[in-house]
Amino acid sequence: MPNIKINLNEIRELIPHREPFLFLDELTDIIKLKKATGKKIFSKDEYFFKGHFPGQPVVPGVILVEMMAQTAAALIAYSIREETFDKIVYLMNIENTKFRKPVFPDTIIFTDVNALRSKGRVW
């Protein structure tokens, strides 16, 4: 199976998020309606590092959760593009999420999302 990969410009066509609240640079390993991997480089210039935490910057956990949500939204929007045109995909649930280490500036983060179940238009 080929590795389907989409870039930032294609992601912008799929989800409504924009800078400074777009936390997805690339989507790879896409299996429609099943799974994908999101990639983001958190550069030292991210706006939230100024206050979280001064002198010891760390990516806030809620930003990492948002990255997961955007990865999932991009997966679903990519998978059913015609049905989601001009619609927003919402995060409904997160299971088995653990933050094992802090994420520091200039770190590349990968987030794997799996669509475990769906009911109608809810995944």
Predicted regions located by residue number:
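Beta-strand-rich interaction surfaces with strong enrichment in secreted/lumenal proteins
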Residues: 12, 55, 99-101
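Hydrophobic core residues within well-ordered beta-strands of beta-rich domains
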Residues: 21-23, 109-110, 123
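Catalytic strand-loop segment that frames the active site of acyl-thioester-processing enzymes
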Residues: 18-59
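Short, conserved beta-turn/loop elements at beta-strand boundaries and strand-helix junctions
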Residues: 31-34, 117-122
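Compact, glycine-rich, soluble single-domain proteins
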Residues: 51-60, 64-74, 91-92
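Flexible, low-complexity linker/boundary loops enriched in proline and small hydrophobic residues
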Residues: 2-28
